[in-house]
Amino acid sequence: LSDLIRISWSHKESPDTYTVLPGEECVIGVQTKGRISLGSGKQSKTLSKAGITGILRGPRTFISEKNTKSLLVYISPLLLSRMIPVPMDQISDSSLSLEDLFSKEAISGLIADCEEADWKGQEASLTLEKFRRLLPLKEEKEKFLPQAILRIKGSLGEIGIKGLASDLGVSQSSLERGFRSRVGLSPKEYAGLVRFGNIFRFYNSSSSLTELALEAGYYDQAHFIREFKKKTGFSPKQWFRQNANLGLDSNF
């Protein structure tokens, strides 16, 4: 499971407003100090101390208080779907309290465990067992879905969904249904997310945005700009100019 889950501590000493871009993972976060809000200005809403953000189609703005420390678990939606009691399309583009999915007692225990791990200075990886106790793994019944994900990634998001379903020996409607309930997106949307990730992977080796668009799997510059704007709120030129000094990471 280690290749499907990443876990780390995040410590923001100063108040911070930051944007999270769509990525291929969902995020479970537990604040051991401080709080995080979703949105900015009058529209902001304080999130619960233990929450989950599903797979995103567009950018999300978060605000962290001074001295906020969080344990963050990045997890593939396919794996998460075997741990939670609701279809993944119910948590797409949403940030929910873990109490919406599990008992109050279980979440209180999890928060206490994470606070103890913080106090003891434990490595993030040592706390993973606490999440595994809360989230027992159900059996994988739709074996074609992990295969579909691998093929979409292997093609860099340039794959026909009808042909993919045929190669996997399932109907296109079964593939679509499986993706919505287990990933939270349609196969086409997921392929778009893979292409979006390619932009950051190939950015440093591309000599121009035109070359980058083709390398990342977009069929022309207009397609690239349109899709990039949907996922960031900016044109590629604007975004890379503003983020020239930042590490290119599409997650927290």
Per-range role (PLM):
Residues 190-193, 222:
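Conserved structured core elements
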Residues 1-146, 153-154, 160-162, 168-172, ...:
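Alpha-helical bundle regulatory/interaction domains
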